């Protein structure tokens, strides 16, 4: 399986997509993210037999942003029964911007899925109810999954997001008005923004999410993080909802479950085989990494891998 991968292959893919740098836009509504140099470019693969391949700036850490929504949902799945989660947040694509209030108002405060901001805030609200120290618990989980004890939050990014949190606060208060929010809004926002401000590199992310390619189990230690059913559910949500309102196009072009963040990172899963992560800070119109999507499309074509 892993014989199709090599560092040379990944370097060649980055060489082909590098001319796209300059055609997208770095996220600027969070000032700390706007300062990230646009020419960063990286890719990394982790196979279920433990091999790592990488190229470019794969050891440079960045703010994972909405990629963290997979981790918060994973944590919630270990603390709640299935029906408890899905009665508060849906499983459908939204077709709306990730921070939309309109759909939330029409649907009486129940977010479409856990990967839009409203849905992720519900998940964080649920974690706030069950964990005494949700920020510390997330660090423990991520450090263990990635095998890196020094992974931490970028306090500058978290602070910058909190200072520009008006829309997310409005989303939370709207859900609270419909009775779908239990805890103090500011406390939940603090947790949510810290999760978004996790700093990881592509290699760490590829290793971190290998449990989604391995029926919910880590490799090496073989620790069962989720049941095979739960891992399947997250992969399905990534395929249908993971790339904002560009999820359909991403499935069409690349054919892998994926989750992006406005920091320019994307993580993808091919169940039973591997995880792949890319990073390029410039985004397309849907808020997904422009060069990153192109690199994933090239990879899918070159190695003939997708879930279809």
Curated annotation (Swiss-Prot):
It comes from Photorhabdus laumondii subsp. laumondii (strain DSM 15139 / CIP 105565 / TT01) (Photorhabdus luminescens subsp. laumondii). The gene is glsA. Homotetramer. Pfam families: Glutaminase. The lineage of its organism: Bacteria, Pseudomonadati, Pseudomonadota, Gammaproteobacteria, Enterobacterales. Its EC number is 3.5.1.2. GO terms for biological process: glutamate biosynthetic process; glutamine catabolic process. Belongs to the glutaminase family. InterPro entries: Beta-lactam/transpept-like (IPR012338), Glutaminase (IPR015868). This is Glutaminase.
């Amino acid at each position: 399986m892993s014989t199709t991968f090599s560092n040379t292959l990944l370097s060649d893919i980055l060489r082909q997509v590098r001319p796209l740098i300059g055609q997208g836009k770095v996220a600027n509504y969070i000032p700390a993210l706007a300062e990230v140099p646009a020419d960063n470019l990286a890719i990394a693969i982790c196979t279920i037999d433990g091999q790592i391949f990488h190229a470019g700036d794969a050891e440079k850490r960045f703010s994972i942003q909405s990629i963290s929504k997979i981790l918060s949902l994973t944590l919630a799945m270990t603390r709640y029964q299935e029906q408890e989660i899905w009665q508060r947040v849906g499983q459908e694509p939204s077709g709306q911007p990730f921070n939309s209030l309109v759909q939330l108002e029409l649907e009486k405060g129940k977010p479409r899925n856990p990967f839009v901001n409203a849905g992720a805030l519900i998940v964080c609200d649920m974690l706030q109810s069950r964990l005494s120290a949700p920020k510390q618990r997330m660090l423990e989980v991520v450090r263990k999954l990635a095998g890196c004890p020094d992974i931490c939050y970028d306090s500058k990014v978290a602070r910058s997001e909190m200072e520009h949190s008006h829309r997310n606060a409005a989303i939370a208060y709207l859900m609270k008005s419909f009775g779908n929010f239990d805890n103090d809004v500011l406390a939940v926002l603090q947790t949510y923004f810290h999760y978004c401000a996790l700093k990881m590199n592509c290699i760490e992310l590829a290793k971190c999410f290998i449990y989604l390619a391995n029926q919910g189990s880590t490799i090496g230690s073989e620790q069962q993080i989720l049941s095979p059913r739960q891992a399947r559910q997250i992969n399905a949500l990534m395929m249908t909802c993971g790339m904002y309102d560009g999820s359909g196009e991403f499935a069409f072009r690349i054919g892998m479950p994926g989750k992006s963040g406005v920091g320019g990172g994307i993580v993808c899963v091919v169940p039973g085989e591997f995880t792949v992560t890319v990073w390029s800070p410039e985004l397309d119109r849907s808020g997904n990494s422009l060069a990153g999507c192109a690199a994933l499309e090239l990879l899918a074509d070159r190695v003939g891998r997708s879930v279809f």
